[in-house]
């Protein structure tokens, strides 16, 4: 590591230690906690997770996919081989009555809505999603709940040993991390005899390992945007081609309103595969003639996800003869770019209940704890960041203003992978934060005690330097002090409503200050300043110079009548914050 990088890292640890009152850099490296560490699940479960972590992790898997991208059939054949070695054939997956969902933003929320709607009918549901926020078992759910540590442990070791026993010289012993969990989910759902499985695509669609599913009941494509460009392509049209790879001959598919280019690609892809593709009407069309629909997830953008989920659930019920019969029929063929409009129907009481009861942590989630309000939304693409800002500003507009002192706004941000942090931060800047805080996706500097939070794909140096780069991007934007308020113009999204946009926050008298911390717990301790009972206040530093922003900001945060903290960017950052704010999630 260069001398400059060494100095940067030393400065970072110094700032973190100053904010927490740790007297040596060694203590900061050890991740000493100022509050009791929540009791971890049984070591047997943790042992299973540690063994899972020894497999090729997601970042390595992405690199492998990039190398093999020219021959997608090889990837799917490899997944089918793993499936066979585990004791299943692709035909066995037909029994799961799968709903297969892809998209760039909103696919997880769409899946959550869909699963909750169908569960409200009394059906036993399986739900496979990624990534996890706090514990890896969140990725595999039965009836909306993560499988228990005991169930995870049982199925993990059963699959692991079966794959070990079937290895030979012609095949690799174990599938990569994500493929292993996909296989495990299929085994869990089959053994636990679910009535249906909602399966969220990992990355893309055409080459994704979930695409060994050959006969889903119905497929869905949520809103498209730019993400994973090194894998999927650098235009929305290229990404749409990848997403359309989950279409199957004769299997109905639904999508929401997209820009003309990617929508045309989806249409052509569906025609080539002989897949009937339908365009979802707006949620307002389904509300006509009845009371408004109440959504369990906040944010105007969730209405698009809910509209798609209603069509997926309605189609599944029809095709399974659970509620009505017959294929979806277009009400007005050729409505838009030669795509038929999906049927407009009156949502049933079960559908309304499912939409209202949907929970999806880390997405437009609000936690209120005394004077602190935490706004959590894992928005890591430009379009998701736009939706996040609209939701955040709308939430602030509807709040009760305190009378006993000033309000403070804090941004807690991190971005990983091939995302463009400068572009994301520019979208967030008009929220007029008083402080911008950056930290890696580490709950503590040392994560050895929690296997669920371990990440072997990057080094500590890499993640710390990336945070410093984020800070530099933010400071550069702050120095310009001329960033236009992007939210005073009409929504760029198809079907968006300018009436939902908020007036700009009155400009502050001074620019936002920025800080970098070495882990999430250090950042949360500084932000909360002892006003959240979970976190002990940082003690005065001994023998170290106090970072001026940390010192001045601490006084302001302690005196504020209300502190609004937006946690966004990486979902893993959101998960780490949730783990610390809600220790029960780790039990």
From Swiss-Prot:
pH dependence: Optimum pH is 9.6 (isoform 2).
Keyword Glycoprotein part of the UniProt annotation: no
Cofactor comment text: A monovalent cation. K(+) is most effective, followed by NH4(+) and Rb(+). Na(+), Li(+) and Cs(+) are ineffective.
Enzyme class, UniProt record, top EC level: ligase
Swiss-Prot/TrEMBL keywords: Acetylation, ATP-binding, Cytoplasm, Ligase, Magnesium, Membrane, Metal-binding, Mitochondrion, Mitochondrion inner membrane, Nucleotide-binding, One-carbon metabolism, Phosphoprotein, Transit peptide
Pathway(s) the chain acts in: Cofactor biosynthesis; tetrahydrofolylpolyglutamate biosynthesis
Phosphoserine: residues carrying this PTM: 539
Residues that, per the record, bind Mg(2+) 2: 228
Molecular functions (GO terms): ATP binding; metal ion binding; tetrahydrofolylpolyglutamate synthase activity
InterPro entries in the record: Folylpolyglutamate_synth, Folylpolyglutamate_synth_CS, Folylpolyglutamate_synth_euk, Mur-like_cat_sf, Mur_ligase_C_dom_sf
List of residues binding ATP: 106-109, 363, 377
Residue numbers carrying N-acetylmethionine: 43
Catalysed reaction equations from the record: (6S)-5,6,7,8-tetrahydrofolyl-(gamma-L-Glu)(n) + L-glutamate + ATP = (6S)-5,6,7,8-tetrahydrofolyl-(gamma-L-Glu)(n+1) + ADP + phosphate + H(+)
EC number: 6.3.2.17
GO (cellular component) term, any one: mitochondrion
Transit peptide start-stop: 1-42
CC cofactor: K(+); NH4(+)
One Gene Ontology term from the biological process aspect of the record: one-carbon metabolic process
Annotated residues for binding of Mg(2+) 1: 130, 200
Activity control mechanisms: Activated by 10 mM sodium bicarbonate.
Purpose of the protein: Catalyzes conversion of folates to polyglutamate derivatives allowing concentration of folate compounds in the cell and the intracellular retention of these cofactors, which are important substrates for most of the folate-dependent enzymes that are involved in one-carbon transfer reactions involved in purine, pyrimidine and amino acid synthesis. Unsubstituted reduced folates are the preferred substrates. Metabolizes methotrexate (MTX) to polyglutamates.
Similarity comment: Belongs to the folylpolyglutamate synthase family.
Subunit structure: Monomer.
Name of the protein this chain belongs to: Folylpolyglutamate synthase, mitochondrial
Naturally occurring in which organism (per UniProt): Homo sapiens
